[in-house]
Amino acid sequence: LIKGRRSVRRYRDRDLAPELIDELLEISCHAPTGVNSRSVLFTVVRERAVMNRLRDHLISRLAQLQDEGRLPEGLTGKYLGRAVIAWQQEGKDILFRGAPHLIITSAPADAPCPVQDTLIALTTFQLIAHAHGVGTVWDGIFMMALAACPDVAGRLGIPENHTLGYAMAFGEPAVEYHRTVQRGPALVNVVKW
């Protein structure tokens, strides 16, 4: 399960069955949380049509920021600017990699471990999705876009008092991997007190 998991950046152009999404969420909500707070919110885009509207809105906003010279500095601005150009000139979706669905985890800022809980929940979702043949990718470009357009979180229904965890695009993979990635040995530090 762990060794076979791969990031998927190409998806089939169709929605997953709603029952499958429900099953993935139902299992994922059992992920461990600090002090058993169980306060992780899963914000989900369940339909490709909604993803298309979200992407169009974000690309429009990012293009406006780019035109006004207000994209973030450094690599973040470079990646976001490239996402705008790729969509406008080539129809290439770097923001969501063509995935029909998106999940964002968040938790109340006053929860005992809001960041850790959201990342554990999203990792659980990823592994359960992989076990069901669903492809996923941690969506850092979307997180950059969300930071550049913070009001979008509210439009997605994420409460103001929540700490954002991370986002993951997902859907039916349009690519099949026949072997795992060969990785080096684990980095281990053995403590000798």
Show the residue positions of the predicted features.
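Small-aliphatic-rich amphipathic alpha-helix that forms the alpha element of a beta-alpha
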Residues: 23-29, 101-154, 168
